């Protein structure tokens, strides 16, 4: 049943972008909720990966991997060749900065499934995905962005 629902939604999505201009970039973000520094859902990408990552007609997937509740990188093995994967490894839900070396290590772990040249780094979601936003100050948000920049410069020299 879950597979038929996924396929049905995928078919609706495909019809929505049929005939899009060649230069229109389509990306998708798989969100688990981001309301005032809390989340709504947990669990890995395993149940949806075989269909979503292999079949969704997008240029890139923006995926949350900021906590263990997101599961491992193994489902990335289903990502179709040439697709980009943006790894949301830096949380927008807490002010504490992630360890740079640990993030670099996780990027290389993800590269076992998707070539490094097709991987990107970002915060796991927006800093204010809804009107109330998250419990981070503006300075804390800029520190997270600076962290992403530093790590990206290390990994993709």
Segments from the language model and where they lie:
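Catalytic-face loop-and-helix region of soluble metabolic enzyme cores
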Residues: 33, 47-157
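TRNA-recognition modules of translation machinery and tRNA-sensing kinases, especially anticodon-binding
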Residues: 19
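Aromatic-lined carbohydrate-recognition surfaces of secreted/lumenal glycan-active proteins
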Residues: 22-35
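Ligand-binding pockets and gating/stacking loops
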Residues: 40-44
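Short glycine- and Lys/Arg-enriched binding-loop motifs that mark or flank ligand-binding interfaces
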Residues: 4, 29, 122
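Single conserved hydrophobic/aromatic residue that forms the stacking wall/gate
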Residues: 2-13
């Amino acid at each position: 049943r879950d597979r038929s629902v996924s396929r049905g939604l995928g078919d609706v999505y495909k019809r929505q972008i049929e005939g899009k201009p060649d230069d229109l970039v389509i990306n998708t973000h798989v969100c688990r909720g981001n309301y005032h520094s809390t989340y709504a859902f947990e669990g890995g990408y395993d149940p949806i990966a075989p269909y979503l990552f292999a079949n969704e007609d997008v240029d890139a997937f923006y995926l949350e991997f900021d906590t263990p509740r997101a599961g491992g990188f193994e489902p990335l093995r289903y990502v179709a060749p040439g697709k980009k994967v943006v790894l949301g490894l830096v949380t927008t839900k807490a002010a504490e900065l992630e360890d740079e070396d640990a993030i670099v290590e996780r990027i290389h772990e993800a590269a076992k499934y998707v070539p490094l040249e097709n991987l990107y780094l970002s915060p796991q979601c927006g800093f204010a995905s809804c009107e109330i936003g998250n419990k981070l100050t503006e300075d804390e948000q800029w520190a997270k962005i600076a962290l992403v920049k530093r790590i990206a410069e290390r990994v993709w020299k």
